């Protein structure tokens, strides 16, 4: 294959009756686009007659019906023209395996030979060349690159879009620096399609050019890196005035630079309170309802305090999405309002950052004895291209294949293997650069995990600071519990075991053997075999231990839905478990001792830089194994105020077992090591109060004796005009009428509601079983309703992808649980109706909840009123907040749980919501009301 500009590509796309040509599925439409001399010179498409029925789901997806095929030509009639176009061409498709198997099946049926020429997969090509995209579906790529795609899932349109995508990607490939192309060519030997040949042709072209594309990059030790931005920190930082009313006012700084900016009293109030607490050294809790503009309300006084003290203020969030919003949207807006630059740095834990030294060593390995898997080769290609684009080296920018995250464990930065200034890559290392940026910043944006690590482990990753804002503070207790707890699984041990490379003579064994051969007098020739036997023995004992744990902890009844099983270490550690653990403990120590010994021995020899890196990797792996054994020991040892539980898969397999421990109450730890050690902390979220009181939050976070200032800000939205809360009085109750009848009622109500809403509906459930059951009942009716259904766990688990698919369909239903109750922003027509299926009480078998409840009851309190109810109310408020996101939104909230009206505690939920019309009536009346609401001419 020759990929210069005179080359010929033929892009083919097929629509079919199914996915398996070997089982009789056939092509019903074929599209073709010819690319020649860097241009799309021909497009064509045709229906294809076949003797198979078109399944309803195919018709829904493509719009193709059996009537379209009545006068269509057979494939044998089309074949001569297709083969003529393919003559001498490279065949291209988006998911080449799918299209090629159907094309070859039809060619052979028509009496022709299958296609034997070069092929190219644009999915594989896109994954390599654009490693940071959220997804690689053709429609997503077309949207990303502004390619016209009028008819998705139609062969002609798909083929033409794929052709233009090919040209775009070819242009990017040929613009890559020569050193990157060299590295890519060496590490893509097992790609599915012709990517290595593409890269080779690009290398030949780029090699003959004068500049080799390299001048735009920082070329360092065979890596092409994005040039770091120039450091303009030559001038002293300018102090800023603080005047919230002026800054956020109707004629203030923000309104002058943003026409859409709206003055909000709550925003001014919050900014002034944050400023006052920073000045006075006090803690503040702020519940800022949706629409108050809380982010800017704390960023403005935070920058003021940073400039005044010449020290950074830390902003900690739970989610990556909010960190990116602050960095990319809110800080730039604040800069415009202030008229001066603000230095904001994102800092995460060390394991988020790539270690260039480790990556260079890995590339040496796969050019030598190590056989890289397909996922590893794809990931390496992604990383090489990403290095030309990234400023941060943060893994969260990447969209790696599944196997790529195992590779990341080998390549991430860690303190054990880091040689700091002795490392040849130190001046280019991402982690020290991130820390340096943080030290110079006005604002340090980080996550709850790193924040808590700094406080409880005293790692000092973050620079010294006195003022802190914790956004998404309703997650802080859970994050602290996770941090102070621990977990260990069989799979974690297997990942460590596989890094040694015992089975495939790869990994550490392959590399250490090479080093031993170079230094035969230092180490016995029998050393590798002895170590393999030790590791195989440890692997066997680990299996025995988890089999014993599974027997001791997990219930044998596979029909049970219970995901978690609580346990007490003293009850579990019977003779079998205890003996197995002691053998694992001893075996692990033997392995660690032997491998550390060889590193000490070899360090006395004259080593190459690659060998030194290998020994660092050995030490890191030994440390990881030692830590894993220590964690497992803690999970088998009882500690007061700790809860222990195990989770497994539906089949209760020992190799899927994971053990957990968590503090029951973390209020004392937070009070003693978190709030006491920081001068002023601002806690903020949209959901911190229950029935107007902050007491639950204060108790959970250990602030009872601190007496923080509390501020509750209502939303500027007019809920009484924008929304209604509707509860059907004739709905069955799950406890009285059974889960099956309740689920059927949910599905029936949802089907009836679609005609009234005529738009997007978000359905929030409290269990995955409910999502799957309702989805199953809805599926046969979706074509008749002209609706699309996207259900968590049915159509995938990736929340962002499901939300994107939901938004792309005007008539669609999105069903989810847990993570869908918060953190998704669906303004305007993105969602017109919200259904809360049940009040979101925690599952009664949740181990942490059970332990907390038991502790409360033992002290004479009510677990329901002090724990279950407040938790449920806060989650309910989070779900409620998904509907109205702007002043222009309108929508309906349906609660299908009559307890909100009938139970004595129902009023606690209602009083925690903003004032809005609430109606408790028969389902038919509510559906009629919905029809009137959406068709009364008052749509936004």
What are the residue ranges of the model-derived segments?
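Conserved non-catalytic scaffold segment of RNase H-like nuclease domains
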Residues: 2-118, 131-153
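Conserved RecA-like P-loop NTPase helicase motor core
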Residues: 717, 728-741, 793-900
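A contiguous, basic/glycine-rich beta-loop/short-helix subdomain that forms a polymer-engagement track
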Residues: 409-442, 452, 457-459, 588-731, ...
